[in-house]
């Protein structure tokens, strides 16, 4: 499994916005028209289903594996639970790099990040919000999640992209997140 996130780290409150780099797509120069981070943050919070892409853990297979998951955008990270024997969990144990996407492609938010095992405090915060959002009783799974028997992953963003179909050329935005700083 990826390393447990034992240290509290401080992060920049907002990532740095810039124009996407995609030659041939007609994106304008400069920063006029870039979307604010709040646009992406809102869509990450409101999405019901998310796509997560991991890299297959088997040595002979290096192709991506995409799957729909339920989760939360909470405290600047994407949190989701999965069985410890699921392909996602096995893949993330070997390679914590992943991509998370919101469900609506016409207002897409794509997050490239690193998955870490969420600590107990994050899990305690995650569970009631998750159950309310999905109207889903985690039942006995709560004990396994809180006792760390089953994983809850927290994807720490490194880069994020917004692609708004209606304003594709003028508003497509890229955000770069600061690396975590030393513990506070």
Model-derived segments and spans:
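Generic structural signal for secondary-structure transition and capping sites
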Residues: 48-49, 97, 135, 160
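A generic local structural motif
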Residues: 36-39, 65-67, 85, 140-141
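Short, basic/aromatic recognition patches
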Residues: 26-51
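A generic structural signal for alpha-helix starts
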Residues: 86-87, 121
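Alpha-helix boundary recognition
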Residues: 44-45, 93-94, 131
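Short amphipathic alpha-helical segments and helix-helix/interface helices
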Residues: 40-41, 89, 127, 142
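Charged, gly/pro-rich active-site loop segments
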Residues: 2-34, 107-184
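Short beta-strand segments
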Residues: 47-84, 90-92, 98-102, 110-114
């Amino acid at each position: 499994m990826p390393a447990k996130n034992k240290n509290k780290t401080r992060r920049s409150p907002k990532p740095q916005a810039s124009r996407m780099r995609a030659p041939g797509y007609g994106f304008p120069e400069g920063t006029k028209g870039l979307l604010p981070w709040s646009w992406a943050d809102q869509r990450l919070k409101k999405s019901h289903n998310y796509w997560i892409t991991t890299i297959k853990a088997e040595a002979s297979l290096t192709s991506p594996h995409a799957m729909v998951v339920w989760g939360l955008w909470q405290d600047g990270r994407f949190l989701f639970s999965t069985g410890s024997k699921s392909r996602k969990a096995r893949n993330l144990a070997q390679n914590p790099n992943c991509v998370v996407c919101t469900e609506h492609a016409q207002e897409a938010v794509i997050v490239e990040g690193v998955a870490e095992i969420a600590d107990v405090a994050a899990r305690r915060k995650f569970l009631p919000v998750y159950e309310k959002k999905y109207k889903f009783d985690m039942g006995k799974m709560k004990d396994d999640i809180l006792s760390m028997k089953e994983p809850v992953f927290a994807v720490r963003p490194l880069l994020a992209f917004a692609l708004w179909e209606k304003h594709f050329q003028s508003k497509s935005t890229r955000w770069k997140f600061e690396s975590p700083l030393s513990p506070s």
